[in-house]
Amino acid sequence: SGAVIQDIGDGILNLEFQSKMNTIGADVLTAINKAIDLAETNHPGLVIGNQGANFSVGANIGMIFMMAVEQEYDELNYAIKYFQDTMMRMRYSSIPTIAAPHGMALGGGCEISLHADKVVAAAETYMGLVEFGVGVIPGGGGSKEMALRASDLFHKGDVQLNVLQEHFLTCLLY
């Protein structure tokens, strides 16, 4: 399997990815769901972390590429939906979820962190939604979570426009 679930003390579960480069595939998503099932029945919380060089370099892009090339669109849509459903389940589970990223937390690894209730990141953590670099949009809900977290910082009545948006609007109005 791509992940191991273990009790790390005080009944807290830890989910440790063990796939190559801690990539996220169906086996890891199944393990996340299993860990949530276990934690919600008998444990006070879930930590997602590992001792590898990197937290996770994201989805298995090779698998996604092959599905697209072979025009297996139903399987590709199912894989994306399974990832999204798993992230939403993690976000709204009845137990606290903690992500402990370190090293690289890219793409899906970043999205897992964004859906956790708490993130305890190592000082040298390189995190981001890098999907645009390979020509795709983040599929696990990371863009939504990033926008929601940013909006939590706004105060009632604030107008939040970055410089690019402001210049773009100026060009359109004149």
Question: Which residues does each PLM region occupy?
Answer:
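CoA-thioester-processing core
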Residues: 106-168
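Conserved small/polar residues in nucleotide/adenosyl-binding loops
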Residues: 174
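Short beta-strand/loop segment at the start of cytosolic alpha/beta domains
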Residues: 1-19
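A structural preference for short, pocket-lining loop segments at secondary-structure junctions
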Residues: 10-16, 29-74, 84-100, 122-126
